[in-house]
Amino acid sequence: MKLGIVGLPNVGKSTLFNALTNAGAQAANYAFCTIEPNVGVVAVPDYRIDKLAQMYSPDKITPATIEFVDIAGLVKGASKGEGLGNKFLSHIREVDAIIHVVRCFENDDIMHVDGEIDPVRDIETINLELILSDTEVLQRRIDRDTKAMKGDKSLAGDVQFFNFLKEQLDNAVNARAVEMTDEQRELMSTVALLSSKPVIYACNMSEEDFAGDLTENKYFNKVKEIAAAEGSEVLPICAELEAQIAELSKEEKEMFLSELGIEKGGLDLLIQKSYDLLGLMSYLTAGKPEVRAWTIKKGTKAPQAAGKIHSDFERGFIRAEVISFDELMKNGSMAAAKEKGLVRSEGKEYVMQDGDIVLFRFNV
């Protein structure tokens, strides 16, 4: 899974990326300090991995991972090549979802590219650039299919849908907010529209606001309204605070958050929201050689889940031996669970569940 972190210059985008990856991307108070996208691979926090590691004492522990890409700051006119627009748009096409960092803090020492704090305008600026780029892409597809329609009348429905979609974009509606059937959504996916990508608005606020009553931050409330209207996710975060937390040990982090009265760090919540947004979950494999989490789409059946490990597992799938994480923990060991007949044998139609611990049987 690849997530692109975007935002106007000086909204805290690179600070958030640094906190996520500890990759040390240069976070500077001027536009375009991130010219090439910095890429960081981040472990997905999962307490089940830790518990299984205690049980198995494995030689290797491999958590699920997410790839974060810090994409250069965007300005008005990017779709026409202003600023670093063309690079920005090409990099963002490659991600599965967008984390749009929005400035919801006031600080006279950190300039805003437009001179004043206005998250609604900032969101509209980026969304409009994505829409303008999409309009050009869509028009090229319409022209191509219209030409091909002379020899293939079955494309008429496609052209009609793409024209309808372009009308929505022309009215500044994000593709992801347009109501459509599953079949139409499948058709739209063949065009790779930027504004169709799922979005989490990360509201970067001051430490004081983040630890206090969120509803008192007027900027956060405005972003929540926008997210609700287009069916996107919104998450309050303090990038500066997360950068500090990222330097702490696990124990120090827990103590620090407890002192602030915060149950979970913003980054953990961001990763969880990303999973939810993309409809992802994890199953686990456990043994002395390795304890590992594997990321799959919700609704994935056992053979396809096995294929994440190796294509031979899917091709020669016989059955899956499955127990839930909670059931295993309750019984203390796999041997005890097997004695009680709690390890199930599941076939090709079994739909994997989050937290399943599984051993695949296969033959090729």
Task: Provide a role label for each language-model segment.
Residues 2-6, 17, 144-351, 358, ...:
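C-terminal-of-GTPase-core extension/linker across diverse P-loop GTPases
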Residues 12-17, 45-57, 85-109, 121-130, ...:
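Phosphate-binding glycine-rich loops and adjacent basic patches that engage nucleotide phosphates
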Residues 32, 46-49, 62-68, 82-95, ...:
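Amphipathic alpha-helical transducer elements in NTP-driven molecular machines
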Residues 9, 131-134, 192:
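Flexible interhelical turns and helix-capping residues at alpha-helix boundaries
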Residues 40-45, 72-82, 93-155, 168-181, ...:
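Conserved Switch II/interswitch segment of TRAFAC-class P-loop GTPases
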Residues 1-111, 139-140, 144:
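Conserved G1/Walker A P-loop phosphate-binding module
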